[in-house]
């Protein structure tokens, strides 16, 4: 199941850098993290769903690239984001 509009708006409001911000790295990573967590729950129940697993791996790679970009450009924002999302690194 895809992310609902309400949930996505809630995540955007929490991580946006300014009003109307939907494309900053923080927002993109936060939305991807929610989707990744949701897909992980699905994969735990449906172990043979290889198409979903592939989509999960693509989302993880996209999030990894965004986090690497943020780490290169602004280390403080990177540290704040991974601590607020509870990601390892």
From Swiss-Prot:
InterPro entries: Ribosomal_uS15, Ribosomal_uS15_bac-type, uS15_NS1_RNA-bd_sf. Transmembrane segments: none annotated. GO terms for molecular function: rRNA binding; structural constituent of ribosome. GO terms for cellular component: cytosolic small ribosomal subunit. Keywords: Ribonucleoprotein, Ribosomal protein, RNA-binding, rRNA-binding. PROSITE patterns: RIBOSOMAL_S15 (PS00362). GO terms for biological process: translation. Gene3D superfamilies: 6.10.250.3130, S15/NS1, RNA-binding. Part of the 30S ribosomal subunit. Forms a bridge to the 50S subunit in the 70S ribosome, contacting the 23S rRNA. One of the primary rRNA binding proteins, it binds directly to 16S rRNA where it helps nucleate assembly of the platform of the 30S subunit by binding and bridging several RNA helices of the 16S rRNA. Belongs to the universal ribosomal protein uS15 family. This is Small ribosomal subunit protein uS15. It comes from Streptococcus mutans serotype c (strain ATCC 700610 / UA159). The gene is rpsO.
């Amino acid at each position: 199941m895809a992310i609902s509009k309400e949930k996505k708006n809630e995540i955007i409001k929490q991580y946006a850098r300014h009003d109307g911000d939907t494309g900053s790295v923080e927002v993109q990573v936060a939305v991807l993290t929610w989707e990744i967590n949701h897909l992980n729950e699905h994969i735990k129940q449906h172990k043979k769903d290889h198409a979903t697993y592939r989509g999960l791996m693509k989302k993880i790679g996209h999030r990894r690239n965004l986090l690497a970009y943020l780490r290169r450009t602004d280390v403080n924002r990177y540290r704040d984001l991974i601590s607020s999302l509870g990601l390892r690194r």
